[in-house]
Amino acid sequence: MITLLLAAAAAQPATTDPLAPLPQPQVTAPQLQTPKPQSDKPRMAPTQAPAIVAAPATTVPTSWREVFDGIRAGNWASAQAGIAALPQDLITPVAKAELYTAKGSPTVDLQSLQSLIAQAPELPDADQLARMAVTRGATTTPLIIPEKPTVGLGSAPSRYRARPVSGEPLADALRTQLDGYVKADDAANAEAAFLVQAPYLSADARAEAAQRVAWIYYVLGQDFEARRVADYWRTGASGEWGSQASWIAGLASWRLGDCNSAAREFRDVAANGTQRELIAAGYYWAARAEQACRRPQAVQGLLKAAASSAESFYGLLARETLGTETRLPPAPTVSTAAVDALPNVRRAVELAKIGENALAEEMLRHQAKIGSPADQPALLEIAKRLNLAGAQYWLATNGQPGVRIAAAERYPSPSWAPVRGWRVKPDLAFAHIIQESNFRSTAVSPAGAVGLMQVRPGSASDEANAAGMSFSPSSLYDPSYNLEYGQSFIERMRRSAYTGDQLPKVIASYNAGPLPVGRWSTIPDKGDPLLWIESVPYWETRYYVPAVMRNLWVYEGLGNEPQPSLKLLAQHRWPGFPAVR
């Protein structure tokens, strides 16, 4: 770092360009004077001249990384000096844009804004810079390269909470009333409240409320009551809530040993569901029910229907049962020649070299929005090459209409490692990361969980202390530290007496914590891990466990590794924690 002393900066005229070189202090040569003769009068005490206080030193960055650090720290003068001093290159417009748009940064004049936009109209911040120019007096909006609309390109099947029925005030009021009963596991009062309003609700609203009441009975182990409520009130419902009620009725029938009713209800789930993962689950469990009823002729067709969802939890279980391929096709090799020379791609490469990964990812995402749809596979290949897993995941799941990306690209496998090395299988950590953050290293949840594995600062501090490591909250944004704390928490959950080294319970503990998993040891699952998963009271954890396990199996398949937990679950046996290879 170079230090400039701006002792006389206050005496210089203000510059309008925030990036102009900082003024240098002026030195005035002393004037020679003829000494005056001394007087015989008593001498007065000399008046002391005011002390000259030097202006604070400004540190001039010697690298672009230091410039970006200065901007984030609010050291505006330092950042300005660095931008002015460093050689002008591809990163210069990025640094200027970051400075100009940073909250609290010095007001930039119109000429500087217009100059930057003209130089780099393809920047991600170009639109914001153009709007700033208008507020500074631009008579016309500066020309930029606009973003084009993007759409979702598809994702792995997943379970999610069904949308509440809308447009019925009575249903809204009942939903709020039932919330308290669900939390208290108070099935009797929940059903009583529902029956008061049932005559005034639509068929779908009745099915929604009945499903919630039935679920309380199911969690309490009162399977007859759960099936009674779900079966009766799903009549006449269409689509999502009818299939949700059928699902609970099917699970209750299965636990009651009624394979005929279970087969019928699970078939209804598959026929009327709208969620791909739930449809596959309906087919798979219907096959189990038919097998339990000794009707093997019906089993294979149902398993094949489930297996058609090749990237789903139950689809992969069905494929393993049928003995068909459980591995996704690998992603094709793509040439990047068409995009290598694009300014934003070149900037991404340079930014990644200096560790500015978030900015590098932003360059690639923005290029996908302003460029040709045909370029997206090459942009994704660049992201993989640069280890920008967050950009890879985004480019695999978002793009302009018409973009086609292989499903395998939705499973980034960056060459990252925890600071103390891998102690859990990397595939398992990455399987969690997809569900936790979609590989966004800067992600922060409303609850304060941070980074790739959504680690809470308090938990990370505990893990760091246990390992004899120093801890800084900012380290959670660093993949190597975030992975370290995440895998340490997985290890702790594995050692917990509540999980018994059983993989589904370890995964559940990562999401819900060990104490709830300990309470769930009383779930009447008949030793069946799939039934245990589907009976977990927390909906988020109930959907989280299959998603992480599916991700793990896909990673193992793409790496041509064995899939031991898939094989064991297909045999309805509890899988243990995977070993590190």
Predicted regions: what is each one?
Residues 7-62, 139-171, 180-183, 574-580:
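Compositionally biased, proline/threonine/alanine/serine-rich low-complexity intrinsically disordered stretches
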Residues 32-51, 62-65, 72-108:
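N-terminal, post-signal-peptide region of Sec/Tat-exported proteins
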Residues 49-57, 80-90, 101-104, 115-123, ...:
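Solenoid-like repeat scaffolds
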Residues 61-78, 164-192, 213-216, 220, ...:
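Alpha-helical segment of the N-proximal tetratricopeptide repeat
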Residues 97-99, 110-119, 123, 132, ...:
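Catalytic glycan-binding domains that act on GlcNAc-containing polysaccharides
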Residues 307, 311, 316, 320-351, ...:
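Extracellular/periplasmic ectodomains of large secreted or surface enzymes and adhesion receptors
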